[in-house]
Structures are given as structure tokens and as C-alpha cells.
Amino acid sequence: MKLRILSLFIILLLFSTLSMAQDKPWKQHNKWIWGPSVGYQYQSGNFLKVSGWGLFAPNDFQYMKIDAGANFSWMEGKTTVIPELGFTYYLNDFVVFPFVKAELTPYTITPKVGASLFSIVDLGIGYGFDYNTKKNFKPIDGITVSVGVNIPLNFHIY
């Protein structure tokens, strides 16, 4: 029951934020679109990814996203939180945006390629390179597969 109420509250908050953004004249809009994201990644184990991001468009065909967040995991009998910075470069191809991405944690660097639906739902694949193994933790390296949902809070249609 609490989860339903929380979900309903979040949905109402998103719709009210989006509708308020539509009421502003074009000149008042910020060129950055920002919001939270949540996702799943497999890279030597399962990770829940939560972050905040900002996206801007230097022109009509390219988009760049910067994000910072945390990866949550339960491995080897304990919960682990790993901070992460990411940079994504999207090419606008109408509905499906191909992208390249780089993610950096204190332990790995992970280049990725993938496709995104309107830069809202991202599907990526890449390879993680472990450069500093965390103490009492297994190396986080190898093939990685991820899916993420980016929730724009100040998106405008025009």
C-alpha cells in the first residue's frame, strides 16, 4: 500500500513538473534538461544504479549527458555502494538515439555503446576494466550489460 501511494505521488509530481515547464515562454527555458535515473547493470555481479543527470544539445543532432550517482550491490555477503561518474554522447536519429558512454568509478572504467529511445530508455553493452580492486571485494571487470530509465523533470516539447 505504501509503495502504491509513493508511486502515485511520484507520478503526480512528474506530471505537474512537466506541465509547468510547458507554460513558460521559449526564452525562459533552460538549455539543460535534468532529472533522476534508475537502472540495472550486470558487470561481474548485479548492480542497481541510481543517479542524477543533466543533458544539453550543442545542436539539433547531438546530445551530451553528464551524470553522477551510485551503484548498489549485494556481493560476498555484504551491501556495497560504489560512486560513479558518467558521460554519454547521443546522436539524434529521430526515435532511436545511438550512443557511446564512459563510466568511471574508483575501481573501474567502462566504455559502452548502445541505443536509446528518445534518450529516456537506454540499453547498453560494454567492457569494464578493473584498475583498482576494492578491498574484500571481487574484481569488477569484463562484459557489462545495462538498462536505464532517465526521467526528465524539466522537459519541454517546443
Predicted regions and their residues:
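Transmembrane beta-strand segments that form the barrel wall of outer-membrane beta-barrel proteins
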Residues: 32-42, 62-74, 93-107, 122-131
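Residues on the lipid-exposed face of transmembrane beta-strands in outer-membrane beta-barrel proteins
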Residues: 36-40, 50-54, 70, 85-89, ...
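Transmembrane beta-barrel architecture of outer-membrane proteins
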Residues: 47, 82, 97, 108, ...
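Short glycine/proline- and aromatic-enriched beta-strand/turn motifs that initiate or cap beta-hairpins
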Residues: 21-59, 65
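Outer-membrane beta-barrel channels and translocator barrels
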Residues: 57-61, 92-95, 118-122, 152-154
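Outer-membrane beta-barrel "beta-signal"
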Residues: 140-158
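Bacterial Sec-dependent N-terminal signal peptides
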Residues: 1-26
